[in-house]
Amino acid sequence: MIERPHEVVFREVETPVCGPGDVLVRSKLAGVCRTDIEVLAGELDRRWVRYPCIPGHEWSGVVESVGADVRDLAAGDRVVCEGFCYCGKCRRCRAGDTHLCEEYDQLGFTRGGGYGELVVAPRRVVHRLPERVSLDAAVLIEPASVVLRGLLRARPAAGESIGVVGVGTLGALTVTLARLFSPATVVAYGVRREELELARLLGADETADVSGGKAPHEGDLDVVVETAGAVPAIELATRLPREGGRIVALGIAGEGRELCVPADRFVLRDLELIGSVGYTTAVWGRVVEVLAAGLVDFDPIVTHRFPAERFEDAFRLMTEREGIVGKVLLEHGG
């Protein structure tokens, strides 16, 4: 539990109350996300996080019990939960934009997440896992849904080229999911040799170290996806598309980060910049489907796992990023 910024405690708390329409899930695995580190550091806008906070919006587990009104899940079912606990009633939810729910509530930010051993979630955000999908892979469904929604908004056609700027977890998932669109080529751009090696392993046709500032295929790519969350990354992303190309910004959001790009670069080259945040419940379901069908494999993206009590080591690894660091998992015992 993060009591307040920079202060973490291990504490026994009462078992969360499982309401009639809720599911009580025993968390087995939780992914360490850059956003979790921002919550610990107090860098996230207070509109989106409530302290004390039990993080963990990327996680998977097993049903412990269900509320009286839940008929289609049972104890022992393997499940994964969407982070956004959307209301299903507001204007945005009725339009299918569940990620923009007017009653913002999110596991791991405003209610207890998968770093805790027991999590309560509304039935509508709980998905039973198909037999073929492992609990490890299920942890990555949340960030994969963020990526897939961004790709769908960019509308890549078969035979087009896709550039991926940044090859952390989001970038690795973008390389993986981009193959679903039958691209002519996927080019991954990064600044660390180890991460570029992982991108190649995941199916990138070409990788480019851009630490020196130069990048191949400038002005040549059909679709570019920015995943790095750094100002230089979005600046590079605006140089890569062809005239009429599309740019999806997935990682750049955050306090103090600004988009400062010459207007002519957009206007005179007819570029489209797409901001994409989160995922809808419909996109989440599609990620589960492609995993179950064996069309994608997330297992190579998981590179490290720690017992939950060693979360500090996991956070340190994510921050220092020595060697190949993909998704880092925390594992609950028992």
Q: Predicted segment positions?
A:
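Glycine-rich cofactor phosphate-binding loops and adjacent beta1-alpha1 units
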Residues: 154, 181, 197-272
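Rossmann-fold dehydrogenase core element
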Residues: 246, 260-300
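Short, surface-exposed secondary-structure boundary micro-motifs
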Residues: 4, 28-29, 68, 84, ...
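NAD(P)H dinucleotide-binding glycine-rich loop of Rossmann-like/cofactor-binding domains
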Residues: 87-165
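Glycine-rich beta-strand-centered segment in the early N-terminal region that forms part
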Residues: 14-30, 44-91, 130-132
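Mid-domain Rossmann-like dinucleotide-binding core that forms the NAD(H)/NADP(H) cofactor-binding site
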Residues: 133-212
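N-terminal Rossmann-fold cofactor-binding loop
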Residues: 189-192, 227, 251, 277
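C-terminal hydrophobic helical "lid"/dimerization subdomain
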Residues: 235, 239, 281-334
